[in-house]
């Protein structure tokens, strides 16, 4: 369970980072 939770967290975190990066580029690029 811990491994699955960690994996899910990593995938969600990666998605959030990508979304944040795209938003940053749109705002400041």
UniProtKB/Swiss-Prot annotation:
Coiled-coil region list: none
Subunit structure: F-type ATPases have 2 components, CF(1) - the catalytic core - and CF(0) - the membrane proton channel. CF(1) has five subunits: alpha(3), beta(3), gamma(1), delta(1), epsilon(1). CF(0) has four main subunits: a, b, b' and c.
EC number: 7.1.2.2
Top-rank EC class of the record's enzyme: translocase
An annotated GO BP: ATP biosynthetic process
Membrane topology: Peripheral membrane protein
Listed name of the protein: ATP synthase subunit alpha, chloroplastic
Organism whose genome encodes this protein: Bryopsis maxima (Green alga)
Keywords (A to Z) from UniProt: ATP synthesis, ATP-binding, CF(1), Chloroplast, Hydrogen ion transport, Ion transport, Membrane, Nucleotide-binding, Plastid, Thylakoid, Translocase, Transport
The protein's role, per its UniProt record: Produces ATP from ADP in the presence of a proton gradient across the membrane. The alpha chain is a regulatory subunit.
